[in-house]
From Swiss-Prot:
Catalyzes the transfer of a dimethylallyl group onto the adenine at position 37 in tRNAs that read codons beginning with uridine, leading to the formation of N6-(dimethylallyl)adenosine (i(6)A). The keyword Transferase applies. The lineage of its organism: Bacteria, Pseudomonadati, Campylobacterota, Epsilonproteobacteria, Campylobacterales. This is tRNA dimethylallyltransferase. Its cofactor is Mg(2+). Belongs to the IPP transferase family. Its EC number is 2.5.1.75. It is an enzyme of class 2 (transferase). Keywords: ATP-binding, Magnesium, Nucleotide-binding, Transferase, tRNA processing. It comes from Helicobacter pylori (strain G27). Gene3D superfamilies: 1.10.20.140, P-loop containing nucleotide triphosphate hydrolases. Residues 9-12 are annotated as: Interaction with substrate tRNA.
Length: 276
């Protein structure tokens, strides 16, 4: 398949996280152009808007007939396809100030409810990501988020994207995850995270990712090596299940099949001139 690859993975976008992200090696990338890898420093934030910008850039410069968007964050993909509102432009200093403000809140959801009941109604009380994003907008604009979004409506994604998902038998998937975890530990996962955790702020976004957060618990002597392996495996299996459910329920026209079937379907779609 003559294609280029766009990584929609919220961990592979970071420099220096190679083992925890199972990032393609430089050798693997040598003959195939990859986008959105090694783009951010550890203490920088990723979000759907950033991936949308990088994806549009990749689509503009890609010389191949097929651009495969792979990974990663189905939530980001859904956000990009449905459209994103322009976010407030704020300086690095303001970001730090806003983060401090939010960190002082004893119950961010209750506070959101008090300043914007309409927005709070749309967000589950456990959805910390969306609560945080809503509060960022409030502190940056001094406007209730629902009013901000009314004034800044979503802009639909301007390109046609075909959606494909790999179907893997449950036991095979679990065995793959177990082996992947073993390989990561054998390749130096703990050493990789130790070097980064001592160098960057403890609240950096990638430190919350599966594989990373458990390694930090091990470094803090809160998990044994055996527990580390078991916890990464268990959390990854749960994530795979959530992603599978999300993909099935949140995307229309999703083609699901084996590797061979998906490959055939992508090639068939590419002949009709669709990138994706």
């Amino acid at each position: 398949m003559d294609a280029e690859i766009f990584s929609l993975d919220s961990l592979s976008i970071y420099k220096d996280i190679n083992i925890a992200s199972a990032k393609p090696s430089l050798k693997e990338r040598k003959n195939i152009k990859h986008y959105a890898l090694d783009y951010l420093n550890i203490d920088e934030k990723n979000n759907a808007q950033l991936f949308k910008t990088l994806l549009e850039d990749a689509m503009r410069v890609s010389s191949k007939e097929i651009l495969l968007i792979v990974g990663g964050s189905s939530f980001y993909l859904k956000s990009i396809l449905e459209g994103l509102s322009d976010t407030p432009k704020i300086s690095g200093e303001e970001v730090v100030k806003i983060e401090r403000e939010i960190a002082t809140l004893s119950n961010p959801y209750i506070f959101l409810k008090s300043i914007d009941p309409n927005m709070a109604f749309k967000i589950h009380s456990n959805d910390t990501y969306r609560i945080h994003k809503a509060l960022e907008i409030f502190y940056a604009t001094h406007t209730p988020p629902s009013e901000y979004f009314k004034a800044n409506p979503k802009k639909p994604f301007a390109h046609a994207i075909s959606l494909f998902a790999l179907s893997v038998e449950k036991n095979a998937l679990h065995n793959n995850i177990k082996q992947r975890t073993k390989n990561m530990l054998h390749s130096g996962l703990i050493e990789e995270i130790k070097a980064l955790y001592t160098q960057y702020p403890k609240d950096s976004q990638p430190f919350k990712a599966i594989g990373v957060k458990e390694s930090i618990l091990f470094l803090e002597k809160r998990l044994t090596l055996k527990e580390l392996e078991e916890t990464i495996t268990s959390n990854t299996i749960k994530l795979a299940k959530r992603q599978n459910t999300f993909n099935k329920t949140q995307f229309n026209n999703l083609y699901t099949g084996s590797v061979k079937e998906v490959r055939h379907a992508i090639l068939k779609h590419s002949k009709s001139g669709i990138k994706g």
